[in-house]
Every structure is written in C-alpha cells, then in structure tokens.
Regions:
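Selective transmembrane helix interface/packing segments
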Residues: 1-242
Length: 242
C-alpha cells in the first residue's frame, strides 16, 4: 500500500488536510497545460505554414464542432465559451496522461501520478464545473429567470431538481475517477507481474506496454467525455428551452 504525505492546517478554526502529492501533480499539470497550449497557439498566422499551427487549428475545429456547437447556440453562447472547452479538455487529457507516462516516488511516497485517480480531486473538479454552470445560467438568464426554472414544473418537482444536482455532481466526479483509477490498478498489477520470474517479467512487460497505450487512448476519451458532459449540463442551464 503506497504512502502519502499530508499537511494539516487550520482554516476558520477547522482542520484542513492537504494532500501534498496531489498539489504537486496539479501544479505540474497546470504548468504543462499552459506550456503546450502556448506552444500550439504562438506565432499564429492567417495562412497556416507549420505543422504546429495545423495541429492547433485541427484541435480548435474538433472542439468547436464536436463539443460546443453540438450543445449550445454557437452565435449566442459558443464563441464566448469555446476557450472554456479548450481549457477543460486540455487539462484533463494532460492530467490523465501524466499518470500513464510518469510516476515520481521517494521512500514509498508517490509524488507525481494521475490526479484524476484521486476521488477528492475529481469531486472538487466536478463541483467547480457545476458551480460554473450555475454561474453561467445566472449570467445569461438573470437571477429571477434562472431560479424560476426550479419551480416552473410545479413546486412539488423542485426537491427532485435539487436532488438531481447532487446526483449529477457525484456521477460526474466518480465516472472520471473510476475509469482512471481502474487503469492505474491494472498497471500496478502488471508491474508486480514483472517480478515473478522470467516468464512473468516477459508477460508483465508486454502487458504494460499494451495497457499503457490503451490507457493513453482511454485518458483522451475520458477528457472528451468529461468536456462534452460539462457542455450538456451547461446547455441545460443557459438554453431558453430548458
């Protein structure tokens, strides 16, 4: 069982536990996301003349066509929310990838791995997204119009709509956590297999290579799914028909 390093501090008189490895990995993920996005979008020209700009434009069209336009009105909301979709999908894709390609540990403590395999992180991220969708709903509809949607179907339905918000939060966070955590568990089992003699080492190494490749694919798919779900929730909050 791997050890973790925690820092306990006080906030408003309450003990707050900070997972140091998660903080380190989050900072690394943010830094890598910033560097990669800046690299892809720097020196943009009207006529693409580099593979880097072609890759950036391909990603831009993919996000706008498959994530944003498919869920919200592009002219009314999409142009202002496009950067949000890019940020979410880039951050989560990189976060998922880090755990597959990199693991930094010392004295039994894992300092760098997939933060999306930490349920606390995915819950916090999902909570941030849910709060953002409510904020967007209030921004585009106004406070009175937005909160009237909770009673428009009858006051008896209101408690169920509130419960739905909590179930969305839990399923949103656990879906990402479950997929990434399961992949890391299997990677750990395959790594253990490499220590069980010659044939175990061969089988374990082959399995690790195959599963790492598959995990990279799953990581990108989960980043895409998380971003699409974000915009589905967002469309429910800002669209007039909801």
């Amino acid at each position: 069982m791997e050890k973790h390093t925690y820092l306990i501090t006080k906030l408003f008189g309450y003990d707050i536990t900070v997972n140091i490895p998660s903080v380190i990995t989050t900072l690394i993920t943010v830094l890598l996301t910033f560097i990669i996005v800046m690299f892809l979008t720097s020196r943009i020209k009207l006529r693409p003349d580099s593979k880097r700009q072609n890759a950036a434009e391909l990603l831009a069209y993919f996000i706008s066509d498959n994530v944003v336009k498919g869920n919200v009105n592009w002219k009314k909301y999409g142009k202002g929310l496009w950067a949000t979709a890019l940020t979410i999908i880039s951050f989560i894709a990189i976060a998922n990838t880090i755990g597959v390609l990199i693991e930094v540990s010392y004295d039994g403590v894992v300092y760098v791995n997939s933060i999306t395999a930490d349920p606390t992180f995915t819950f916090s991220l999902a909570l941030l997204i849910i709060v953002f969708t409510h904020f967007a709903g209030i921004k585009y509809k106004g406070v009175k119009h937005y909160f009237s949607t909770y009673t428009s179907s009858g006051i008896g339905i209101t408690p169920f709509k509130v419960i739905e918000e909590f179930t969305n939060l839990m399923t949103f966070s656990m879906r990402l956590f479950g997929n990434i955590y399961a992949g890391e568990i299997l990677l750990a089992l395959l790594a253990t297999l490499t220590t069980l003699g010659f044939f175990g080492a061969i089988a374990g190494m082959v399995g690790l290579v195959v599963w790492k490749g598959f995990s990279l694919f799953i990581g990108f798919i989960q980043a895409y799914i998380f971003t699409v779900l974000t915009f589905i929730y967002l469309s429910h909050k800002i669209s007039d028909e909801h």
